[in-house]
Amino acid sequence: MASVWKRLQRVGKHASKFQFVASYQELMVECTKKWQPDKLVVVWTRRSRRKSSKAHSWQPGIKNPYRGVVVWPVPENIEITVTLFKDPHAEEFEDKEWTFVIENESPSGRRKALATSSINMKQYASPMPTQTDVKLKFKPLSKKVVSAALQFSLSCIFLREGKATDEDMQSLASLMSMKQADIGNLDDFEEDNEDDDENRVNQEEKAAKITEIVNQLNALSSLDEDQDDCIKQANMRSAKSASSSEELINKLNFLDEAEKDLATVNSNPFDDPDAAELNPFGDPDSEEPITETASPRKTEDSFYNNSYNPFKEVQTPQYLNPFDEPEAFVTIKDSPPQSTKRKNIRPVDMSKYLYADSSKTEEEELDESNPFYEPKSTPPPNNLVNPVQELETERRVKRKAPAPPVLSPKTGVLNENTVSAGKDLSTSPKPSPIPSPVLGRKPNASQSLLVWCKEVTKNYRGVKITNFTTSWRNGLSFCAILHHFRPDLIDYKSLNPQDIKENNKKAYDGFASIGISRLLEPSDMVLLAIPDKLTVMTYLYQIRAHFSGQELNVVQIEENSSKSTYKVGNYETDTNSSVDQEKFYAELSDLKREPELQQPISGAVDFLSQDDSVFVNDSGVGESESEHQTPDDHLSPSTASPYCRRTKSDTEPQKSQQSSGRTSGSDDPGICSNTDSTQAQVLLGKKRLLKAETLELSDLYVSDKKKDMSPPFICEETDEQKLQTLDIGSNLEKEKLENSRSLECRSDPESPIKKTSLSPTSKLGYSYSRDLDLAKKKHASLRQTESDPDADRTTLNHADHSSKIVQHRLLSRQEELKERARVLLEQARRDAALKAGNKHNTNTATPFCNRQLSDQQDEERRRQLRERARQLIAEARSGVKMSELPSYGEMAAEKLKERSKASGDENDNIEIDTNEEIPEGFVVGGGDELTNLENDLDTPEQNSKLVDLKLKKLLEVQPQVANSPSSAAQKAVTESSEQDMKSGTEDLRTERLQKTTERFRNPVVFSKDSTVRKTQLQSFSQYIENRPEMKRQRSIQEDTKKGNEEKAAITETQRKPSEDEVLNKGFKDTSQYVVGELAALENEQKQIDTRAALVEKRLRYLMDTGRNTEEEEAMMQEWFMLVNKKNALIRRMNQLSLLEKEHDLERRYELLNRELRAMLAIEDWQKTEAQKRREQLLLDELVALVNKRDALVRDLDAQEKQAEEEDEHLERTLEQNKGKMAKKEEKCVLQ
């Protein structure tokens, strides 16, 4: 089979087929003195294709007797057909070399290569018929040859062109060029569902084993001296075993029937149990199951009521519970009761082969009548499972792991898999027929894929999937999968199971139409009796990835492929991705009705689930996979999310047992065991709430009504009530953080970015509407200096200690926090009164309730809101942690402070002002946020945890270790803020604070990691910014419009602030910009191609040998990962191709404008050289586009004028002609 990766490389490329004709004219070969060739043959070859010339005798020359020449008096023509491929953007075809080999043919006919030379066929390819004279110099392969040369003419004729994946572009020879395929009679394999590529047993081996088995039977039956008939039967079998393997199988089938006849006559008691042993599941498989079962039973009872018969014990458990099949074999082999000599291993093996053949004949009968009814040929008893699947179980168990003790706990392994590989338990009562799909606590990629395929196709007639080879040959299985997900693309009922080529063609065309790379062709299945396993697996993996949302998309391309970033799913962080709000709100309302689990440990579990959803490449640069959970997906979040986590475990085989267990356990939606269902619900519910909670903040009154909470005027609560409530939330938060931190460290030691998710302080920074933040920034900064600085420094250092130290100090810090909160409340009141008096000349005793604030104060708040929005934009761009966190009002501040202290986070050096005074403008603009905080505090077991988890997801990859560059910058800014705030006057504080804000807007430290990952923030915040606002909120929204627009622009560019070629799914550009991205993609492809070639070679070797299952599994995981990356690159290149062909100038103009605005939003000093070049390219492109558009407008204008002139001319002409016609009519008179 041709290399799978080669086919994957050809996806999206153009192909042209050429016919080349070589006309040999003269061959010169110079030899050593001691040797001369007999006859020479020129072979033109590539891989397994060979085109040989006739043998010609070598004639020594006159001048140099060691140099001889072969001359063709009539040129000999050798023709080949070559398919050349090229990238849509490339000018020339890809390289394809054919080799000329000069061979010496001895008198005995033996050939030996003497010299070789290769030519690149693309150099001679031409769309027009051409003929080229070629003189090739050869490289000697033998010491006997000194030099060689060949003169010939090479003609090229262009045949046709098309897509590289078109069937007529595939060379039939190349389909089988990688290895010799096992080609047999297609009709035989049509009904054969037994063949598994890795478990093939050739006929000679089968014959030898059957002979051995027959001898064992002979010995077994000879033990009973009274049963002469059985001895004769065995002798008869023994004599027949010398014949060919095919004959043996037919004879043994006949003998099997003869044994059943003997059993009915009761002539041989051994035959009854033996027949049953040969076919332990004979009831459902035979044509008359009930009678056949009853007859041996009666005979057995009449002859053997004692336990003399060793097979009697086996039958009952096998019929009652097919899952006990391995234990039954254990009983036979390892723990025989009385007659040890009679209980031999061989009768079991006998059943293995004989039963295989009997099932095969039964399938043949069914196929000849109606193959669609193959799985339901006869109604089995209720307590029996599908006999064909059990057959496959029996075969695989015996071939793969013949030692029965290993197989006996199979049921237990399957139960364990409910957690570690939940996909393996389908909703049907049958377990996976293959031994445990978990190898070394890692999910078995191939087995989980097989189970997925079975699950998807389980109700389709004519489909029975047991392997990755013959089960797929007639195309019905592929068609069933396509019909399951896209019934509009294929009419399954109209398919003919005998039409292999047409079935496969319909399936492959359907998958290609929805963007799945085409790796198989109908001719593969027609020509190859046993399709290539790796190709089928890879194709199926692509199909599963597509329909389950596991497809990767390019985020950022680096020079080194291992550092490039991909994300799972097709979620767009682009603000123009236009998520349907109706869908989003509908989903939100559904989520709010879901019950929430309140165990504190579930918080830690959910932390782990969030960590698992971060896709980490080899370099550890992460991207949140939760981005792909949009309502636009055809899968619901509950479906997409587990698949997201599944991919993580696929790509990182070194995952811990707990992590891999959960990820694979939720791999297939709705298929969970009892032990895992609760956990899965927690994970799904929490994960979905992460997305929905952001919208919940905007439902000002809706959230109040749903949760029966108090109105959004927080000042009505007393300080003591608040602090008590905060204490409850704080305790829960501490416990949760401790659990999550310890579990998280164990979860994935490879990822350096995951420990950054534990700062609730920084999380809250982006949780609520940005419009609130700046309003109380002054209070926050002032309270920083007046709070206890020693405790703050201790807290900062505390972040570097282990979680154990945090736990020891939690109780003492609780009391400290309470006291500090009370002090801050008093200070907040005094500060608010002072500020109101100084700035607005209002009453010095400003009331503490929202309703009494002046209009001037509202204006000041709005101005501060705009300032805060700009600051947040700068923070998001720079990766600096939020040293000056927003004041959300008393509840938010206190809650934030409690959480921060409880978690031992470094941001504890920031104190939040808890001024009870909340201006009316704030309730108008952000009352929903405050209300939501209040709701959180009233139900701390639920909402505080969920809000915190949501915020963790938003900022989970932001570096937060105390010694990181970004945190160092934050510390510096915070300390400078503290110094500034110690001055006495309010005006000076305001001035200094503005300077601090400017520092945020022009940050000193630029964190590369954060630039890659910060886009997740906007994927949630855009819904807040674009949500339907309440009427009272619009005034503030208008004021902050400019800030929001700037944020949207920054969002678009955050993926590519410091890289040469960064791929932004939200942007499309033309011309030079496209060329630059394509260059980066091609570089990435080359690196992936190099690695994939090695992986495929090694994987094929491991699959053929089957020696190292763990390495094979690791290679399989890496292979699937590479395939997924390759498909992501293919999709990106297709997008760029479409964009390049975009001839709509208006659309191009909009796209260019959009990209340019995003570029210009970055400060000049922050731009790299690459970004400056790209910006210049965009400007040039835009200017050229404007010029083109102007030229078009002028042309159109000229054309319109010309058209008007022509219309006028036509009108004049018509009027003149009309007058002439009228005159003629007047002259016409009837006579």
Curated annotation (Swiss-Prot):
Protein's name according to its UniProt entry: EH domain-binding protein 1
Annotated function: May play a role in actin reorganization. Links clathrin-mediated endocytosis to the actin cytoskeleton. May act as Rab effector protein and play a role in vesicle trafficking. Required for perinuclear sorting and insulin-regulated recycling of SLC2A4/GLUT4 in adipocytes.
Main location: cytoplasm
Coiled coil: 185-210, 808-879, 1076-1100, 1136-1230
Phosphothreonine modification, residue list: 694
Gene3D superfamilies attached to this UniProt entry: Calponin-like domain
Ranges for domain bMERB: 1056-1212
